């Protein structure tokens, strides 16, 4: 009689433990899904902000190019224009990263590719903001 109770209690404990493990796995998978969704939302927002920033920078660079185009330029202004043209090419390559860096990314895994594009964006956007700021400052100084 004692043996039947021991087996019954052991079975109840084992089934309760199995249910708790299953519930833990479900809650972990639900958390993973929620984290992934929030990461997608953050990436989407970041992509939209970056796209807007690129559009604004392209517009500013084109405006500066058209301003400098119709008058004689000094050597310094010529160098700024060369840099702006290079920046415009780099910004265009960010719009189509598959085509622009197809040769660069052969043989890399996905993490390395993501790091490469992040580094490329930082490498491009840092000098671009400085260049645009300097060019706008010089333009305002000349106008003022």
Curated annotation (Swiss-Prot):
It is found in: Secreted. Residues 19-43, 73-122 form a propeptide. Keywords: Amidation, Amphibian defense peptide, Antibiotic, Antimicrobial, Cleavage on pair of basic residues, Cytolysis, Fungicide, Hemolysis, Secreted, Signal. Expressed by the skin glands. Belongs to the bombinin family. Maximin-3 shows antibacterial activity against both Gram-positive and Gram-negative bacteria. It also shows antimicrobial activity against the fungus C.albicans, but not against A.flavus nor P.uticale. It has little hemolytic activity. It possess a significant cytotoxicity against tumor cell lines. It possess a significant anti-HIV activity. It shows high spermicidal activity. Residues 1-18 form the signal peptide. Coiled coil: none annotated. GO terms for biological process: defense response to bacterium; defense response to fungus; killing of cells of another organism. This is Maximins 3/H15. The modification Leucine amide is found at residue 143. The keyword Signal applies. GO terms for cellular component: extracellular region.
């Amino acid at each position: 009689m004692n043996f039947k109770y021991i087996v019954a209690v052991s079975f109840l404990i084992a089934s309760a433990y199995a249910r708790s493990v299953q519930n833990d796995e479900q809650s972990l998978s639900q958390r993973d899904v929620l984290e992934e969704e929030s990461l997608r939302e953050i990436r989407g927002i970041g992509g939209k902000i970056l796209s807007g920033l690129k559009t604004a920078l392209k517009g500013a660079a084109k405006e500066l190019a058209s301003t400098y185009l119709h008058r004689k330029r000094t050597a310094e202004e010529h160098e700024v224009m060369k840099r702006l043209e290079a920046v415009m090419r780099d910004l265009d390559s960010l719009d189509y990263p598959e085509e622009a860096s197809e040769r660069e990314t052969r043989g890399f895994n996905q993490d390395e590719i993501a790091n490469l594009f992040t580094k490329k964006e930082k490498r491009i956007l840092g000098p671009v903001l400085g260049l645009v700021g300097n060019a706008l400052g010089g333009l305002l100084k000349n106008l003022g």
